[in-house]
Amino acid sequence: MNINKESIHGFLKQCERVLRISKKPDNEEYLTVAKVTGVGIIIIGLIGFILSIVSQVLFYS
């Protein structure tokens, strides 16, 4: 891996560009992301619970 001054400078310029473009989410966007994440976690949990119940019924009866 060859690290030189130009590659470090280029990386820092890219980081600066990303930080300039990015913004803090407003309350509405934050709540939407939180709701979608929560619903996704609940759905994955329900799928795991249903699979657990089905496997117990099929293999332990």
UniProtKB/Swiss-Prot annotation:
Query: Which InterPro entries does this one have?
Result: Prot_translocase_SecE_dom_sf, Translocase_Sec61-g, Translocase_SecE/Sec61-g
* UniProt source species: Methanosphaera stadtmanae (strain ATCC 43021 / DSM 3091 / JCM 11832 / MCB-3)
* GO cellular component annotations of the record: plasma membrane
Write one Gene Ontology MF term: protein transmembrane transporter activity
- The protein here is known as Protein translocase subunit SecE
Describe, as the record does, how this protein assembles with itself and its partners. Component of the Sec protein translocase complex. Heterotrimer consisting of SecY (alpha), SecG (beta) and SecE (gamma) subunits. The heterotrimers can form oligomers, although 1 heterotrimer is thought to be able to translocate proteins. Interacts with the ribosome. May interact with SecDF, and other proteins may be involved.
Q: Which UniProt keywords apply?
A: Cell membrane, Membrane, Protein transport, Translocation, Transmembrane, Transmembrane helix, Transport
The way it spans or sits in the membrane comes to: Single-pass membrane protein
Gene name as annotated = secE
Tell me which domain of life the UniProt entry assigns to the organism this sequence originates from.
Archaea
Q: Which biological process, per GO, is one annotated for this protein? A: protein secretion
Q: Where are the transmembrane segments?
A: 39-59
Q: Which family does it belong to?
A: Belongs to the SecE/SEC61-gamma family.
Query: What this chain does, per the record?
Result: Essential subunit of the Sec protein translocation channel SecYEG. Clamps together the 2 halves of SecY. May contact the channel plug during translocation.
Q: Where in the cell is it found?
A: Cell membrane
Q: Which Pfam families match?
A: SecE
